[in-house]
């Protein structure tokens, strides 16, 4: 009887350890989806947390030589393209034949990547298509892990349904539908989190759901509804402010995030989408650092 009790106890302990390991893994996977979906939503409007980005341009110089053995008989022709006044530049390839030589140079430049300098650019639909297609592969593994836990099966199945909808809207290059369908995907994350993570993690996701709701509503410029969503976000964030654990660990971060959230709400009185995006970007950068 003693041996049976010991074996049963070990089996239960191993089972609990396996469950805890799986929960930890699923929490990391939810964090991945959190970052991935926010980044994808930002790309729709050319928003980035980086104020500068590096880009490159290739320029080609051609030389033709008549091979005559006379002084000053060589004629060179060079035609650069791109702005050489920017930073960087190095030769990447050099090819020659009997009478001609060509040299290709890659010019590296630093470009401003703020809201006001990027918003007039077209949405990179090809990039979005690639990101969503890659998400299918990631989700198949994540869904399998979630099925091993106490997560509602309907909520798990809903992700694939919404992912199909988002992919179709991206394929159709429909901006408004794309943002709404990506938001539906993100809104599932707190439901998953409540089964595997602590209250802090879930409360942060709930707060971001409301802020992303406001972000998506900028397409309609419905400022009254945007303000309501941000009021909901402030109420959700109250759970973070009142949480002793996270305040002990990072009180400065909690306070700064709250200030930026209030500033985001106040800026809606201006009723300017670009100003909203600037404040939205600052808030999202800060709250992502709390996790």
Regions found by a protein language model. Give the residues of each.
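Sec-dependent N-terminal signal peptides
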Residues: 1-2
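C-terminal motif of bacterial Sec signal peptides marking the signal peptidase cleavage site
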Residues: 5-9
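Mature extracytoplasmic or organellar-lumen-exposed domains after removal of signal/transit peptides
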Residues: 11-291
């Amino acid at each position: 009887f003693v041996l049976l009790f010991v074996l049963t106890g070990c089996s239960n302990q191993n089972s609990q350890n396996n469950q805890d390991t799986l929960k930890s893994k699923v929490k990391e996977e939810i964090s991945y989806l959190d970052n991935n979906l926010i980044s994808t939503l930002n790309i729709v409007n050319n928003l980035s947390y980086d104020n500068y980005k590096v880009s490159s341009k290739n320029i080609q110089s051609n030389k033709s030589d008549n091979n005559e053995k006379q002084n000053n008989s060589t004629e060179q022709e060079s035609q650069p393209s791109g702005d050489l006044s920017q930073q960087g530049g190095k030769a990447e390839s050099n090819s020659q034949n009997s009478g001609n030589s060509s040299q290709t140079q890659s010019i590296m430049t630093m470009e401003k990547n703020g809201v006001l300098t990027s918003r007039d650019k077209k949405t990179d639909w090809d990039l979005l298509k690639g990101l969503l297609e890659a998400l299918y592969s990631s989700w198949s593994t994540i869904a399998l892990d979630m099925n091993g836990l106490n997560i509602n099966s309907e909520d798990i199945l809903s992700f694939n349904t919404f992912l199909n909808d988002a992919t179709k809207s991206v394929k159709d290059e429909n901006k408004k539908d794309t943002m709404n369908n990506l938001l539906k995907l993100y809104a599932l994350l707190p439901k998953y989190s409540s089964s595997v993570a602590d209250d802090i993690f879930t409360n942060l996701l709930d707060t971001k759901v409301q802020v992303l709701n406001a972000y998506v509503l900028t397409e309609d410029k419905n400022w009254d509804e945007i303000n309501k969503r941000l009021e909901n976000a402030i109420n959700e964030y109250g759970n973070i402010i009142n949480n002793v654990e996270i305040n002990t660990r990072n009180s400065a971060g909690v306070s700064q995030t709250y200030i930026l959230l209030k500033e985001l709400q106040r800026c809606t009185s201006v009723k300017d989408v670009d100003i909203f995006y600037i404040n939205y970007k600052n808030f999202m950068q800060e709250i992502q650092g709390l996790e």
